[in-house]
A protein has these predicted regions:
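Iron-sulfur-associated redox domains of electron-transfer enzymes in respiratory
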Residues: 5-204
Length: 204
């Protein structure tokens, strides 16, 4: 598999610059990444220490769903007074988040969630969280498990523009090819452009 046909929508990030990029990014965003948990499995968690990010995992035990549609969430409170009720919506302060190191199949799963929550009546809380999120996927050069079936369900191992990712990282050995998947990602990456270079034409 080679880079997207739209090479003007792709950049190169040298691996030695990745940590510096993420360190600066964490000043502006809450960073969620795959990390090794105490039980020995991998979880998508808030990143406090960049050294805990682990990209050599197969799948995480949790999914993106819990960040956008948690099992429990307080959405309003109410007061009963003189036989009537007053509803007080909870004005949740939603952080801007970057989800880094995602598998292609997990990103495609979010597309199905988006479709469901786009139906009327729209879930405004879901979209409040979703619109403040950037999804950065890592294409699988090799399936992490023999049981993976993403090829048959068209959920990976590589994604095309419009298939859910904002940025897609493809491992090219010493470098990452970084593909831009959305207009939102194009705006997102502008403050960090100094970490990226244009790809060599030979990659096409």
């Amino acid at each position: 598999r080679v880079a997207s046909k739209k090479m003007n929508n792709a950049y190169i990030l040298k691996k030695e610059r990745l940590k510096s990029f993420l360190k600066l990014l964490m000043k502006d965003f809450s960073l969620i990444s795959p990390q090794l948990a105490k039980a020995g499995d991998f979880l998508l968690q808030e990143t406090e220490d960049l050294d805990r990010i682990n990209l050599n995992y197969d799948i995480t035990s949790n999914t993106l769903k819990e960040f956008f549609f948690p099992a429990r969430e307080t959405i309003f409170s109410y007061q009963k007074k003189e036989g009537s009720f007053k509803i007080n919506p909870i004005q949740e302060k939603v952080p801007q988040r970057v989800f880094f190191g995602l598998r292609s199949c997990d990103v495609r799963a979010v597309c199905f969630q988006d479709h469901f929550f786009s139906q009327e009546p729209k879930d405004e809380l879901y979209w409040l969280k979703r619109n403040k999120s950037i999804l950065i996927s890592f294409a699988c050069n090799r399936p992490p498990r023999r049981s993976c079936f993403c090829v048959y369900t068209k959920t990976g191992p590589f994604l095309e523009e419009g298939e859910g990712f904002d940025l897609q990282f493809i491992d090219f050995g010493r470098d990452y090819l970084v593909e831009i998947g959305t207009d939102k990602a194009g705006k997102f990456i502008k403050p960090y452009k100094r970490f990226f270079t244009l790809p060599d034409k030979s990659i096409e």
